[in-house]
Amino acid sequence: MIQWLTAWQKKFQVPKPPSRHRASSTFLSFLCMLLAPRLQFQFARGFFRKCGGINRVISIRTSHAMSAANAQSEAKDITASPAIGQHIHHDGKDYTTIKEGLAYILVPSAGPTVPQTTPKGDNQPQSVFYNPIQQFNRDLSVLAIKAYGEEAVARKKAADDKKRKTVSAKSKKRKREEQDAKSNGVEKMARLDDEAGNGKADVGEESELVEGETRENTAMGVDEATTTAAEGKDTDKPVGNAQNGTAETSSTPKPKQQTFTILDALSATGLRALRYSQEIPFTTSVTANDLLPEATRTINLNVEHNRLTSKINSVTGNAITHMYAFAGETPLDSNRYKPSKKYDVIDLDPYGTAAPFLDAAVQAVRDDGGLLCVTCTDAGVWASNGYPEKCYSLYGGLPIKGMHSHEGGLRLILHAIASSAARYGLAIEPLLSLSIDFYARVFVKIHKSPADVKFLAGKTMVVYSCDQGCGAWETQLLARNLLKPNKSGKGTYWKHVFAQAPTVGPECQHCGRNRHLAGPMWAGPLHDVNFVQRILDELPKLDKETYQTTTRIEGMLTLALEETLAPPPRTDELVPPPVPKGRADPSVVDAFPFYFIPSVASKVIHCVTPDEIAIKGALLHAGYRVTRSHTKAGTIKTDAPWSFIWKVMREWSRQRSPVKEGAIRDNMPGWKVMGLDKPKEEQEKRALDGEKTDEGKEIVFAEWLVKDADKKKLVRYQINPRENWGPMNRAKGPA
């Protein structure tokens, strides 16, 4: 049958029908009906399976096309009001809207909404760089700039009011002199007329009348007749206010809005610029700069979508070149009171180190108290011991090798900013310095003061760190700032002199291991407690939906507030010269930098890790101050010397966790720390009597003295909420 059907097809030249045509399908179905039942069944089953698969493909493609058509019809224009998850179609591309704070940014719909490249490379790389991990950084920056800006705007307003009052006083004085000159001229004219017409008897009365009227009109600020007679001008324009007696002249400057300008030097998507414009109410202008034209186009797109074209100016160019263009500007023209072209705030948030931008930034920000915000994400350089040569070339100092490396990194960054500014007679004042996750963020005020710059050498230190032994350290200032009485004996002045040679040897006095050198680095305070407190005071007023990281901000700023130990009181009776209002004392040095970790110390002497509260209680009972550092959990910051810290650790081991015999060998750091190198008699005496304080008192682990038991639960040290919590990869390709 099959052979006959094939021969019949060739004889009549019937083409083989494709399965996608309905007519051919009908023809084949008719032929199958003529065939044997079994052959008909097998042929029909295969045919209809094939037709069904094709129909499914057609159905899927049709549904996709319909979905795309529906999405195209639902897509909104760039001018639509921004909203979360909004679909925007612009210039042939589709975008999805992401909200952070009060700003909205557009990301390509083809890419992931919250991009995060895993080590396996599962997700697509970004075409527009957006890192949601740094929302904490951006939230904190908005609050810090707002706290700084409120004070800066108030300072500008006070200076402007003072200038207006000075100009107004000069204008009033000139007006009085003109009025007096006019009055004297009228009186003289009236006296001459009276002498010529009526005689001397009537001159006195007429003169008194004219003089009285003139004084009355002058007091009211009107004097229309006199002004008309003397100048010949019409008197319709008001020159005074008869109700309150205050003069209003065109020469007196009127109150104006204070300018507040911000530079987002490395803007990427423009998210920071958008947030600063939306969330800082007194911001008048924000410049969003980026090197790549693709990034600038993205910035313009986001600015247009957020309807902020009047506030944000996008610039395509090198950030260093852009900032150097403002280097020659002065903050204020003393003769004409011209506003400065320099920025009030410059935000540096690069991918990696900010070191190449610092020299230009300190010259482009206002030098009468401008704010510099700096982020450095290269913690592998300034907080590790792997690249000391790279750290020195970028920050001018060597990193610390040890548990306190992150605080050392902050001080290296501040040292780089301070040394860059000092070349131009600029002094820095750190307001807030934080080590966060994988990056550092510092907020620094810049002001012109060659006198304050002289303190920099005495606020710069090197660190001798026993990183291979017990972990102790010693600091050494490069110079000394000494307070001396002046020649009259009624005042004092600061004298800047050389420091002594290194006061410590190459070996650690506690364990005998070799020390390593770190620095030079910043030795001044890391924070301004008043500035930090102002931010904390604003947190309860914030909308938690807008600022989603306020819980962590509160915890970290509370730690920053607590870790700032006040300097010790002066031992002499000399009174330092007064510090200008609004400035920090340039002579203050952080006498107690860095911290120690009880778990690390217990590892040295091979004992059970002591309770943090017990160690703090022992230090407090001995009269020392204790707090903790924001850089790492489990840290203790204190003004106690390392010699006493090891006394506390030895006493803890003696009372609570005796060391097993043979656990510490003579080649270990703990051998000398525990006093095992001393004679047997001395060891036995110490074991019986225990450690004593410097005053000969017993060491007591007074846990009841510790008041930092968390009554209010704060997120002081956040655990990474998900995997791959880091800086992410650079953006690739056009948006």
Listing of model-derived features with the role each one plays in the protein:
Residues 33, 47-50, 55-735:
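SAM-dependent transferase fold signal centered on methyltransferase-like domains
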Residues 2-4, 11, 27-48:
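N-terminal chloroplast transit peptides
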Residues 20-22:
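Compositionally biased, intrinsically disordered low-complexity segments enriched in Pro/Arg/Gln/His
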Residues 10-11, 16, 50, 55:
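Intrinsically disordered, low-complexity polyampholyte segments enriched for Lys and acidic residues
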